[in-house]
Amino acid sequence: MERILIIDDDITFALMLKTWLSKKGFRTETAASVAAARTALAEGGFSLVLSDMRLPDEDGIALLQWMSGQHMEIPVIVMTSYAEIQNAVRCM
């Protein structure tokens, strides 16, 4: 069973996504900050990360850079309600 990390400080949205993915057969964990996400990712075992772009302690770009520095080759989908081309380019 695939394991997915959901990173979002909007707890309602994160729990909705967690519930939906769990019903589809995925194992999920949530983190509400980049710091909590780093701790979870360091434990390993994730096959996908779904991350909000703007988090309370750092942004999703900082997390992507940290993951790259740790040589983590986990697919990441960055989510945001701020539809700006600049954000999409920064994530690439």
Say what each PLM segment does.
Residues 52, 80:
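Active-site residues of response regulator receiver
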Residues 8:
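Conserved acidic carboxylate
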Residues 30-48:
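Acidic, metal-coordinating helix/loop segments flanking the phosphotransfer/catalytic sites
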Residues 39, 61-73, 90:
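Short amphipathic alpha-helix used as the core "switch/output" element in two-component signaling
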Residues 11-29:
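Two-component/phosphorelay signaling modules centered on CheY-like receiver
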Residues 70, 82-83:
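Short, conserved "switch-loop" micro-motifs in signal-transduction and mechanochemical regulators
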Residues 32-33, 59-62:
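Acidic catalytic/metal-coordinating carboxylates
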Residues 45-47, 70-75:
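His-Asp phosphorelay/catalytic-motif detector in bacterial-type signaling
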